[in-house]
Amino acid sequence: MTPETRYAKSGDVHIAYQVMGSGPIDLVLIPGLFTHVEHQWEEPSFARFLGRLASFSRLIVFDARGAGLSDQAPELPPMEEQMDDVLTVLDAVGSSSAAIFGLSQAGPMAILFAASHPERTRAIVLYGSYASPRRQEGYPW
């Protein structure tokens, strides 16, 4: 069963989000490049993954600005605006602090969120991620 999709306003942009589960901690899954909160349930393995996360937490998922059901953006917004969208969704669901799960490309933004908002960050989880999206001095990959 697909959870209800709701919207939170971040500046002039509507951010689509869903909440499922009722565990003792809030867990916000920050999406990678491609997201769609309703279509993600159509992929059986990803739906099982989300269900497992929701079995021990109150899982909060959202579509990034410019993707899925969130308002479209003419270009990829700066990481700081994306970080504000996470705050907007946390505020909309009444979460004072959450474990932040950065999936793939969302890893750097999850790190920035945790560093900028330690009072709202209970823990940080990175999966399939990286510290920098491109080669730079001090990060030669």
Q: Model-predicted segments: where are they?
A:
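Short, hydrophobic/aromatic-rich segments at coil-to-beta transitions
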Residues: 1-6
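Conserved HGGG/HGGXW glycine-rich cap/lid loop of the alpha/beta-hydrolase fold
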Residues: 7-69
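Structural signature of beta-strand start/N-cap positions in the alpha/beta core
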Residues: 58, 97-99, 121-123
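Catalytic nucleophile-loop/oxyanion-hole region of alpha/beta-hydrolase
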Residues: 71-83
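Conserved acidic catalytic loop of the alpha/beta-hydrolase fold
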Residues: 80-98
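Short beta-strand immediately N-terminal to the catalytic nucleophile in serine-hydrolase-like folds
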Residues: 100-102, 127
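Gly/Ala-rich beta-loop-alpha elbow adjacent to hydrolase catalytic centers
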Residues: 102-106, 110
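Flexible "cap/lid" loop of the alpha/beta hydrolase fold
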Residues: 111, 115-116, 120-141
